[in-house]
From Swiss-Prot:
Post-translational modifications reported in the UniProt record: Proteolytically cleaved in vitro in a calmodulin-dependent manner.
Superkingdom per UniProt: Eukaryota
Keywords recorded for this protein, A-Z: Cell cycle, Cell division, Cell projection, Cilium, Cytoplasm, Cytoskeleton, Flagellum, GTP-binding, Nucleotide-binding
Membership in a protein family: Belongs to the TRAFAC class TrmE-Era-EngA-EngB-Septin-like GTPase superfamily. Septin GTPase family.
UniProt region (G4 motif), positions on chain: 207-210
Protein task: Filament-forming cytoskeletal GTPase. May play a role in cytokinesis (Potential).
Biological processes per GO annotation: cytoskeleton-dependent cytokinesis; protein localization
Residue span of region Disordered: 18-43, 433-453
Entry protein name: Septin-10
Gene Ontology CC: one annotated term: cell division site
InterPro entries named in the record: G_SEPTIN_dom, P-loop_NTPase, Septin
UniProt source species: Bos taurus
Subunit structure comment from the entry: Septins polymerize into heterooligomeric protein complexes that form filaments, and can associate with cellular membranes, actin filaments and microtubules. GTPase activity is required for filament formation. Interacts with ADGB.
Length: 453
């Protein structure tokens, strides 16, 4: 009997669990159906198929901006390569090797190809790698990139903002020029790229690739990529999620880093003029893929992936900076219990926190003020006691000096009185002495006269 009751209860529990599970599945299915939009067929033409054309026309009217950061040692060919990439002489003056610090020089140009306008900003690292102490050579570059992110963030946070007219100066790509001399990456190169890989899209290029043979160049490429991977440096990978360009981008990812040669000089090869470098042993054609990877770089950088570089800068690198800055300011997407927070809730919580912090600071300042006042009062009282003691001492000394002077005065007056008495006595005596000789003379004269008679 007991076993039958147990089986009955177990069966009821199983039925209840199964029913609850089925109800949960039905509820989830209904929720998904509720959340997903319904697909409908229109009975006629509406016109929103022209949205892509509208977007293209608006973009062409607005124009585009593209910002390139060139990092590399002085004289490695940064300016020449940029001139060659855009087929323009940007008139950048040669830099000296004797700058005490690394500084960044940004120059903006307006370019137009057909009806497309491009605002191109080229940022050059002047004096990079020229100092004896290269420990902090990468810091000005990091500071510059962060400064551009901060400027864009401040524009975004304005109450009255105008991002449509704002000149976006955020760096979209960093062309990192690697010297072809040596057998591996320099420590400065590793430190710099490691510091920049989370802030900018890095495309490493081997500059002046005509300085080494093809065999050495291939070994050098393999060595560089191995060092980048082993040191955790994240370079820009051409995207493969778009089917139209996935195949060529995947192929080009295998050619990194690009070995490039730049030149604006034209040399006659056969029956045509080509951009090339003329050497005693022959000609290195810039746009010949058998000679260097310049064409690959131009195709990947400008023709195929320029918009992806701009998008990666905004959606990845800038978002990382923005999230970090907002978290430092106290803004969070979720609360303590992983509940979503609105901006108003975050603001109110932060305002309450700041209010409490202000109250605490005010209380601390009051206590500190009272403590300082007490300390000052104690110091003043001690100084007052010292002054009072000094005053009493001086008063006592003055009194003693006064008594001593009065005693001297009394003695002096007594001496004066005694002297006066002596003087008076002396004068009397002198007068008596002066009068006595006269009377005797008269007596003698009278006596003589009597005798004569």
């Amino acid at each position: 009997m007991a076993s039958e009751v147990a089986r009955h209860l177990l069966f009821q529990s199983h039925i209840t669990t199964k029913t609850a599970h089925t109800s949960s599945q039905v509820s989830d299915h209904e929720q998904k159906q509720k959340d997903s939009p319904r697909s409908l067929t229109m009975s006629g033409h509406v016109g929103f198929e022209s949205l892509p054309d509208q977007l293209v026309n608006r973009s062409i009217q607005q124009g585009f901006c593209f910002n390139i950061l060139c990092v590399g040692e002085t004289g490695i060919g940064k300016s020449t390569l940029i001139d060659t990439l855009f087929n323009t002489n940007f008139e950048d003056h040669e830099s000296s090797h004797f700058y005490p610090h690394v500084r960044l020089k940004a120059q903006t140009y307006e370019l137009q190809e057909s009806n497309v306008r491009l605002k191109l900003t080229i940022v050059n690292t002047v004096g990079f790698g020229d100092q004896i102490n290269k420990e902090e050579s990468y810091q000005p570059i990091v500071d510059y990139i962060d400064a551009q992110f901060e400027a864009y963030l401040q524009e975004e946070l304005k109450i009255k903002r105008s991002l449509f007219n704002y000149h976006d100066s955020r760096v979209h790509v960093c062309l990192y020029f690697i010297s072809p001399t040596g057998h591996s990456l320099k420590t400065l190169d590793l430190l710099t790229m490691k510091s920049l890989d989370s802030k900018v899209n890095i495309i490493p290029v081997i500059a002046k690739a005509d300085a080494i043979s093809k065999t050495e160049l291939q070994k050098f490429k393999i060595k560089l990529m191995s060092e980048l991977v082993s040191n955790g440096v994240q370079i820009y990978q051409f995207p493969t999620d778009d089917e139209t360009i996935a195949k060529i981008n995947a192929s080009m990812n295998g050619h990194l880093p690009f070995a490039v040669v730049g030149s604006m000089d034209e040399v006659k090869v056969g029956n045509k003029m080509v951009k090339a470098r003329q050497y005693p042993w022959g000609v290195v054609q810039v746009e010949n893929e058998n000679h260097c990877d310049f064409v690959k770089l131009r195709e990947m950088l400008i023709c195929t992936n320029m918009e992806d570089l701009r998008d990666q800068t905004h959606t990845r690198h800038y978002e990382l900076y923005r999230r970090r800055k907002l978290e430092e300011m106290g803004f969070m997407d979720v609360g303590p219990e992983n509940q979503p927070l609105s901006l108003q809730e975050t603001y109110e919580a932060k305002r309450h926190e700041f209010y409490g912090e202000r109250q605490r600071k005010e209380e601390e300042m009051k206590q500190l003020f009272v403590q300082r006042v007490k300390e000052k009062e104690a110091i003043l009282k001690e100084a007052e006691r010292e002054l009072q003691a000094k005053f009493e001492h001086l008063k006592r000394v003055h009194q003693e000096e006064k008594l001593r002077l009065e005693e001297k005065r009394r003695l002096l007056e007594e001496e004066i009185m005694a002297f006066s008495k002596k003087k008076a006595t002396s004068e009397i005596y002198q007068n008596q002495t002066f009068m006595t000789p006269g009377s005797n003379l008269r007596k003698d004269k009278d006596r003589k006269n009597s005798n004569f008679m």
